[in-house]
Amino acid sequence: MPDPAKSAPAPKKGSKKAVTKAQKKDGKKRKRSRKESYSVYVYKVLKQVHPDTGISSKAMGIMNSFVNDIFERIAGEASRLAHYNKRSTITSREIQTAVRLLLPGELAKHAVSEGTKAVTKYTSSK
């Protein structure tokens, strides 16, 4: 007689398929909490720059971590600048100055020009 523990196939190691709804004791279905990430936006930019290139989930995790880190650094520096100047609002000027302080040389120049372009596009669309 076969052992019941060995007859059922073992789940694959590292399989990470999330169940969309978990079953509660009283029979009601509960939605799983959503994990926010920048993966959709990173993927869109990747396809603009290199249409034929893909990205692994590990690399996407690193990119997501990088974007979160840069966001926190810029937000923190902009907050400090607003506080130093006795302002209660973070404007595009604080963000721009924070970017200039945090990013080195040519990278800061490109970031500022892209940011200015994005703000101009946003204000013209309103």
From Swiss-Prot:
GO MF terms, alphabetically ordered: DNA binding; enzyme binding; protein heterodimerization activity; STAT family protein binding; structural constituent of chromatin; ubiquitin-like protein ligase binding
Residues bearing the modification N6-(beta-hydroxybutyryl)lysine: K6, K12, K17, K21, K35, K86, K117, K121
Modification N6-butyryllysine, positions: K6, K21
Listed Pfam families: Histone (PF00125)
Q: Where in the cell is it found?
A: Nucleus; Chromosome
Under the cellular component aspect of Gene Ontology, which terms does the record hold? Answer: cytosol; extracellular exosome; nucleoplasm; nucleosome; nucleus; protein-containing complex
Q: Which of the residues bear the PTM N6-(2-hydroxyisobutyryl)lysine? A: K6, K13, K21, K24, K25, K35, K44, K47, K58, K86, K109, K117, K121
Cross-link Glycyl lysine isopeptide (Lys-Gly) (interchain with G-Cter in SUMO2) mapped to chain: K6, K21
As stated in the Swiss-Prot or TrEMBL entry, residues carrying the post-translational modification N6-lactoyllysine are K6, K12, K16, K17, K21, K24, K44, K86, K109, K117, K121
Q: Which residues carry the post-translational modification ADP-ribosylserine, per the record?
A: S7
Start-end of Low complexity biased regions: 1-12
Key words, A-Z: Acetylation, ADP-ribosylation, Chromosome, DNA-binding, Glycoprotein, Hydroxylation, Isopeptide bond, Methylation, Nucleosome core, Nucleus, Phosphoprotein, Ubl conjugation
Role noted for this protein: Core component of nucleosome. Nucleosomes wrap and compact DNA into chromatin, limiting DNA accessibility to the cellular machineries which require DNA as a template. Histones thereby play a central role in transcription regulation, DNA repair, DNA replication and chromosomal stability. DNA accessibility is regulated via a complex set of post-translational modifications of histones, also called histone code, and nucleosome remodeling.
Q: Kindly provide the name given to this protein in its UniProt entry.
A: Histone H2B type 1-H
Q: Which gene encodes it?
A: H2BC9
